[in-house]
Amino acid sequence: MVGWLSTETGFRAIGQTGAVTVETDDWERARPVHELPATVSTGATGRCRRLSVNAPVAADPEPSDTQTLTTTTSPTLTLRFSSAGAVTTDGDGATVSFQTPSPVSIGVSERVHRPEPLTVPPSPAGIATAVTAAGDRLPDGPERSFPALRPAVPRIEFDASATRDDDDTRPIQFTVPDELESVLVAAPLAYYLGASLTVGASRPRIEIPALEFSLPFTPLPAFASETAATLQRLVALDSAARRVEGERLDDAPLAALELTPDHVTAVEPSVRYATFLDADQPAATTWHRSTYVEPTIERARILPALLDQLSLVYPAEATAVSPQELLESALEDFFRGVVSVTPLAPELGVGVSHGWLADGAVVDAFKTTPAAYDNATERTDDAETLRLTIVSNDPEMDEELALAETYRNRTNAVSTEIEIHESLTTGELARVFERPQTYVHYVGHCEEAGLRCPDGHLSASSLSRSGARAFFLNACGSYREGETLVEKGSVAGAVTLDAVLNEQAATVGQAFGTLLAAGYSVRRALALARRRVPMGRDYAAVGDATVRITPSVGDAPLLVVEPRGDEFAIRYEVAPESGGTYRDPFTGRHRRRGAWQTTVVDRARLRSVLEGRGIPVEFDGSFRWSGELAADLRSQGL
């Protein structure tokens, strides 16, 4: 993960291996003109007269209308701009100048090697040992709250003969009952504290012996909500105290405790966290993710992926969903198949994103499995071009083929190839799913035997592998087929739990594709898209739905616009992240992702906000693109 900060004078990319700064004094956001390689993870597109980079660069030797500069240090920054740009270098950096404001695309990537796996016994104590070792790699200071500065967590491997080091002298001790569920729930907090996590206590407790500090917790199930609130508070206070170049957050949470960033950063982590843990202050942040885990050793093996994302962990508890709750009713339109799944409603904790790492199909959470995380780790995805395929095996749903134009227009920040197929046979469709590519969008019918084709049905279980990183099976009752695609090699996808109307399927498909192309994750794109139809809960995500098919070039925000007489209320919503920030375009202040405020603007200001931003807008309950909405408002005299 690379941290991408928008600063007062440009941008700063921060990674595990270093940082690089781009400075420009006249940057204006704009739709991309020059394609970036698909290997970039984030960046920005806009226009300027001049920009400089504080790292050595190499130029693409191939003559072209587009110039490419790439830093020779890590993280790797890629600049693409027209041949009219004049480049000067001095060995330590480069400056690009234009006679008039000109389009520039900036992308950043970083290749970080995951550490060697940790081998531990397949037991609660073994898992606790792995969590303890993972916490040793964190920075000492409050900058551990900045996601890009947290090193990758080592994978876990099991060996019953592996030995544990019981001679632990870490300043912070976290003891829990000798049961896997308590270890899993405690893991995110113990990891973030850099604590020694051990088993054997009758009730959970954090102790800092040198300070004679002790904090007891209530046993499960209350333990889960208590650890969640504690971790939220620690990250919020660390975020207020950290000093990451290019970022400045409000330190009001510290001031409320009569602390300053200087006081906090000057002491050892154990002293800092004893102070924070003892504080009577509620968690003041919207959390990004919670995962509900069935306590088995096989699922515990995936804990490093959850710690990498700093997901909260809760016990997997759920109740059956009644047909009434799913808004099932007599529907006059015809259904496109009848392969239904009886879903569960999980008992959700805090968070915007919810993952279900347990048996059963669920609503309001994405169903993930160990295979999804294994697939994400094993895939290299180092191709410089996104490869997308749209398949329509239902002539009455051909309107979704128009998504090809959306993908072309909205993924043009990066190099993209798109294929369109209609009425594929079972063999042809199998080859589509098996070949390596970024994404497959399937429209058609799903029945008990599989996805319907002109010559029969294709069952995902018959595939040798699933080569698509992500997918959307926009067909009735496609849940089981989607689960199988993940088991066969995909990372995540969108599916349906039951029969859906053609019209609603098309509406969700168009919105989902539009948002996915804008750099949204599978989970967030589906969560927003399904709000557009009354039976949206019939759509679900499987696998690690935090995956994106396109780089997030910018914040990947959603503008929510509400008319208020002659004025408009605007919210610039950026999805929460584990300690990440964004720069509010209205105030210029850095805010934690997931925190936003409403700004009231007049017509002229609204148009200026919308123009030059290729981002989705929720306006009067419908999704639009900002530039298109600006043109409509202008034509209406608004």
Label the predicted regions.
Residues 1-106, 600, 604-606:
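Long, charged/polar, low-complexity intrinsically disordered N-terminal extensions
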Residues 6-8, 16-17, 25-26, 92, ...:
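Acidic, contiguous N-terminal accessory segments
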Residues 43-73, 78-80, 88-90, 150-304:
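Long, folded non-catalytic interaction modules
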Residues 110-145, 226-349:
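Mixed-charge (acidic/basic) macromolecular-recognition segments
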Residues 175-179, 391-395, 421-424, 443-445, ...:
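Structural motif
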Residues 283-439:
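A domain-level signal for caspase-like cysteine endopeptidase catalytic cores
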Residues 439-524, 528:
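Catalytic cores of nucleophile-dependent amide-cleaving enzymes
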Residues 517-638:
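Caspase-like cysteine protease fold
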